[in-house]
């Protein structure tokens, strides 16, 4: 299911969290209908999705603003602010990464700096897949692989960093409970069951960020294994049973979907996204021809 990307200014990238949820509901219902699988046979499900996006909810659980997603580049000043307050080396020692515009923390500080009225109303911060989880279960939860990309997690110890949050004056109550990827975080709510066709007895586990989930699916779950993906972004991903942090912050280190393990990644943000931009801006005739033939351009 394709949904819009909003770019109100050059270098900005936003999506509506509601679009993700509606896409998830439609897809789940379609899969159950076409497969003929009895809902009672769906014992559990895990959730995966794009990482780093900032979803802000008010006290009633309503979305406060469109999500600033992973490829948004507006937060360079906030990255400098983080390094100035925390120190680059200390930040890497805690989060295993330097401050980056793609990560959630700098996006949160941008909202605090530029949209204080929105920040003041915020009571919950979620990642994209975890917003879908919340809508399916009513639970505010995340898991270690995706939380690693928020830049508020103590990656070596797999928990929120109280030290970092205190230094940046961020209320820890805004953050969801952190689980391991394989742990149960809740079950399908009555409302979501009616919309999706799933059973209320279906358990929902932590799941993983997109590439961490792909690693499990491709068997990259032990030392010496790696893979490369070309999706919206491009990634080279390697599993490690021992924590490995680049002190210069040249590659990402995140908690792995496998409990007690981590992974390192090299990333380029513009792979498939660049191809989509080229298609949408320079291939209009080809898109029209594909539509006439009933093909995906």
Q: What does each of the following model-derived ranges do?
A:
Residues 1-2, 70, 147, 269:
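A generic structural motif
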Residues 1-65, 93, 121, 176, ...:
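N-terminal glycine/serine-rich phosphate-binding loop of ATP-dependent small-molecule kinases
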Residues 3, 180, 256:
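Active-site donor-binding loop signature of nucleotide-sugar glycosyltransferases
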Residues 17, 76, 83-100, 105-142, ...:
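Active-site core segments that coordinate phosphate-bearing ligands/cofactors
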Residues 33-70, 98-104, 133-154, 177-180, ...:
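Short beta-strand-loop/turn "lid" adjacent to the catalytic site in phosphate-handling enzymes
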Residues 55-57, 80, 275:
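A short local structural element in Rossmann-fold oxidoreductases
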């Amino acid at each position: 299911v394709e949904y819009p990307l909003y770019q109100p200014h050059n270098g900005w990238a936003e999506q509506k969290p509601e679009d993700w949820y509606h896409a998830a509901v439609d897809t789940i219902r379609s899969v159950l209908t076409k497969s003929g699988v009895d809902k009672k046979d769906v014992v559990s499900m895990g959730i995966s999705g794009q990482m780093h996006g900032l979803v802000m909810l008010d006290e009633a659980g309503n979305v406060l603003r469109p999500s600033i997603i992973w490829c948004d580049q507006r937060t360079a000043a906030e990255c400098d602010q983080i390094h100035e307050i925390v120190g680059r080396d200390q930040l890497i020692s805690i989060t295993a990464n330097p401050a980056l515009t793609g990560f959630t923390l700098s996006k949160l500080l941008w909202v605090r700096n530029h949209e204080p009225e929105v920040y003041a109303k915020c009571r919950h911060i979620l990642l994209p897949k975890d917003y879908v989880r919340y809508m399916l279960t009513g639970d505010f939860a995340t898991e270690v692989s995706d939380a690693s990309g928020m830049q508020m997690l103590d990656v070596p110890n797999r928990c929120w960093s109280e030290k970092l949050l205190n230094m940046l004056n961020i209320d820890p109550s805004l953050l969801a409970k952190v689980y391991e990827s394989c742990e149960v975080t809740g079950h399908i709510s009555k409302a979501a069951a009616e919309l999706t066709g799933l059973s209320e007895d279906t358990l929902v586990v932590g799941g993983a960020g997109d590439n961490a989930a792909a690693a499990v699916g491709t068997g990259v779950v032990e030392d010496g294994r790696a893979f490369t993906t070309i999706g919206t972004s491009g990634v080279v991903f390697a599993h490690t049973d021992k924590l490995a942090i680049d002190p210069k912050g040249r590659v990402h280190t995140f908690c792995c979907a496998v409990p007690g393990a981590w992974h390192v990644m090299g990333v380029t943000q513009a792979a498939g996204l660049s191809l989509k931009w080229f298609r949408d801006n320079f291939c209009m005739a080809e898109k029209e021809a594909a539509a006439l033939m009933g093909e995906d351009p």
